[in-house]
Amino acid sequence: MDSAADPELASAVVAARASVRARLRAEQAERLVEPFDPALYNHQADLAENILFGEAVGPAFAPARLARQPYLRAVLEAEGLTRPLTEIGLAVARNSVEIFADLPADHPLFDAFSLFPAAERGFFEDLVARQTDAILRRGPAGHRDREALIGLALRYNETRHRFGLIDAALEARIVGARHAFARMLPAPLRGAVEFHDPARVNPAASLEENLLFGRISYGEAGAERRVRALVRRVLAEEGLEDAVYRLGLDSRIDPAATGALAEGAPGPRERVAIDLARCLVREPDILVVAILLEERAPANFEERLAHLRAARAGRGLIVCLPEAADPAALPPFDAVVRVAGNTVAA
């Protein structure tokens, strides 16, 4: 959301926060959303998110480079958190190596719950095997190990991963580091973080987070479904549905989100469906759709194709079928062109 481009919508979203909170209260469902509070640790966010208390803008505080970001590392050192976070990272590495030891790299559980990608598993297995105390190592190798372990700690979420590594005392120290981080942020980096502010929208955060001004609770069964249904009711009551649809159509889906960071994000099929829906909404003169062989397996394939043809009635539709497909088994097309390699065969 760009509050400068659409200040009226931004103000409406901030006002809707109060309505969402009031509705949660009325339905005795406040526990389903943990609000952003500058003075409290948010248990639905990871450790890095609790320190930043906002959204990174640009590469300076991007998750992949956060553990080696000089200013953040200086804050951790000043707040006495370098050693605790290294110890947390080592504990995470040990637990993860043990839990995922017998799983192949492409196993869905590894992608969904591991704090490091499959490509880095060998590195952490080696680190755990050779190092009993990451704090004591010196030299470039030790520096590299500590950086990797701090990176694991920054991605750790106690509510989600449940290794028992963050207690109330450490939460208070992390909140203290949050305040130091914001207070001393150098001028050149002030545009690199959009902090959460109850009085304005966060242009770098999702619309959902802006409306909730918080995170949906991991530990409550059905929380996402209940909260999102409630939010939709509030949007309808406040006349914001059309504006939200416009924002959705204007948004790009990030194809690079993986692992824990992609929890709840659309998968490959959903992204294709969203792109197809966008094309249909734009009503182009000609629409070209390629259908893979495996996509013809579902029982409702012919029904889906019929819906697509109905949606494009009176306009151009080109359907590219795999070589093994038999167009004769489908309702007749106006024309069928067979292609072999790059040559029209018939």
Locate the predicted segments by residue.
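ABC-fold ATPase nucleotide-binding domain signature/coupling loops
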Residues: 1-50, 55-69, 83-210, 214-232, ...
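Well-ordered, non-membrane alpha-helical segments in soluble/globular domains
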Residues: 68-72, 227-231, 299-310
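Long, internal scaffold/assembly segments composed of regular secondary structure
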Residues: 71-83
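Conserved catalytic loops of ABC-family nucleotide-binding domains
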Residues: 283-285, 298-331
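Structural motif
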Residues: 289-293, 320-324, 340
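Conserved beta-strand-loop-alpha-helix hinge in the C-terminal portion
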Residues: 328-346
